[in-house]
Amino acid sequence: LMKTLVIAEHDNNTLKPATHNAVAAAQAIGGDIDILVAGADCGAVAEAAAAIPGVGKVLSADNAVYANQLAENVALLIADVAAAYDNVVAPATTGGKNTMPRVAALMDVAQISDSIAVDSPDTFKRPIYAGNVIATVQSSDVKKVITVRTTAFDGVPEEGGSATVEAVAAAHDAGLSSFVGEEVAVSDRPELTAASVVIS
């Protein structure tokens, strides 16, 4: 049976809705679904992920090297864990777009970016030319790295599941980057990638 690993989007405290959309995309692909939570002091996130219906288990990589989810470190972890999976799915958010191309390169596969529909386990639809054309892409890679446009998939429920949580001991520090700071712009409007209506 095919196995898919979904990469959780979170801030070490709360699980982001984009994760539920990514799980929905994984369900469309089919097979068993596990979730990887990489962070520091992120136990609450792992428990929230375990409550998602349809998830078999949650892999929790709780280590200081993942505190700020630096793409260089997280990509090494994902590529390591992904050895046991057929597909790796992540939301096409800022974090996903930063990390997943590195994962695809480490796994030596072509990434399927910004998918908006799943036709079959190896065939996906994605927008090109600023959304004016919808391309149907079939992957011949044995393992697939996929980012999904969150607004194209209705999120799965937050409650109802009872997945087990397993600790992942691997701590990958690439030593290539360091966290300097973060400036968060506060807005009462949703993020563009999560907005149900966009007016331009």
Please give the residue ranges for each predicted region:
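N-terminal glycine-rich FAD/FM-binding segment characteristic of electron-transfer flavoproteins
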Residues: L1-S200
